[in-house]
Amino acid sequence: MKTIVKLDLDKKPWEQDGQIHNRWHPDLPMIAMVKPGDEFRVECMDWTGGQIGNNDSANDVRDVDLTQVHYLSGPIGVEGAEPGDLMVVDILDVGTFDDSQWGFNGLFAKENGGGFLTDHFPEASKTIWDFHGVYTTSRHVPKVRYAGIMHPGLIGCLPSKELLDTWNKREGDLIATDPDRVPPLACPPTSQSAVMGRLSGDAAKKAAAEGARTVPPRDHGGNCDIKNLTKGSRVYFPVYVKDGGLSMGDLHFSQGDGEITFCGAIEMAGYLDIKVGLIKDGVKKYGIKNPVFQPSPITPTYRDYMIFEGISVDEAGKQHYLDVHIAYRQACLNAIEYLKKFGYSGEQAVSILGTAPVEGHISGIVDIPNACATLWIPTEIFEFDIRPNADGPKIMVPPGVDVSFTS
């Protein structure tokens, strides 16, 4: 397997021979060219570029510079790719580095990123997870062990200038409705901390000022955080520029549906083994607007779940109309309160929901006024039985063990 992106984790992202970028822009030069049918390896930094350490303090999570993220490897060109084609990407393997057998999960401070449950957990915290082959455990969250579903949280092709302008316009219009909101409604372009691959000089400055942040998923894929995009899966990406420009990063060892902690998976450095192909004029042939994918046949299978429901009624008891966001939040909060009965802190429970292979489902979307969302927690990940019984829950978490907080 040929490695076409080779990184040095002891160096900063901007010291990697132009192989890293953290903005989306059509003018980014291809760092390598491959042919349809080629198989190759791409090494990736963790999404923060090494800002988070394997330690017992959350100060680095509190102070993380979010103008830097995400650091992506690429873009990689595919010979013959043209706008309107579909780029076929087979994820052959996802792996860890031998000298980096750990990852991290964090709750961001409300003033610096926040997250899905930031009003309930506004302070920064962190958990470290150690890798044992396909399994992971944490010194900060005892009594759980689960098989990872390693995947890229972020992968996609470069946008065209027209698509980039569309993104910036629609997200700018949204920000304008509440420009002082904390956390913000969206992340507008900023040249601060921009790393523009192999662009240089005035061209790099111009692209940095208008390049799209990598934070959200968009029409091209991007930061979708889909845990099922693991080895054995296939993705069909719309192509918007000549050669396609495939970039990837934000690798996860394991993640729950929704990535509710925002820094919401077990984040890691590692590698992707990729095979690429093309379907000429595939966007028109299949009417594809956003990427579509086929899941892997080899993901871990759990047989028994505790499933928590949530409806469109918020924490204050106010009724909302078919609001899936509120319903999923309520399902998560219900699960957190349940796990606390076994001795987990709220932060430990949130970390479990963000890192374990939990399933999130929209179970009902038509029965007015309530949507119903469900959160499925596999019971087999725990070293004890979490199912209800007549004796009631018992405290199973050793005293004094918790997530890392700030000092």
UniProtKB/Swiss-Prot annotation:
Pfam families: FmdA_AmdA. Hydrolyzes formamide with the production of ammonia which can be used as a source of nitrogen for growth. Also acts, more slowly, on acetamide, propanamide and butanamide. It comes from the Bacteria. Its EC number is 3.5.1.49. Disulfide bonds: none annotated. This is Formamidase. Gene3D superfamilies: Acetamidase/Formamidase-like domains (2.60.120.580). The keyword Protease does not apply. It catalyses: formamide + H2O = formate + NH4(+). The lineage of its organism: Bacteria, Pseudomonadati, Pseudomonadota, Betaproteobacteria, Nitrosomonadales. Homotrimer. The keyword Transcription regulation does not apply. GO terms for molecular function: formamidase activity. Keywords: Hydrolase. It comes from Methylophilus methylotrophus. InterPro entries: FmdA_AmdA, FormamaseFmdA. Transmembrane segments: none annotated. It is an enzyme of class 3 (hydrolase). Belongs to the acetamidase/formamidase family.
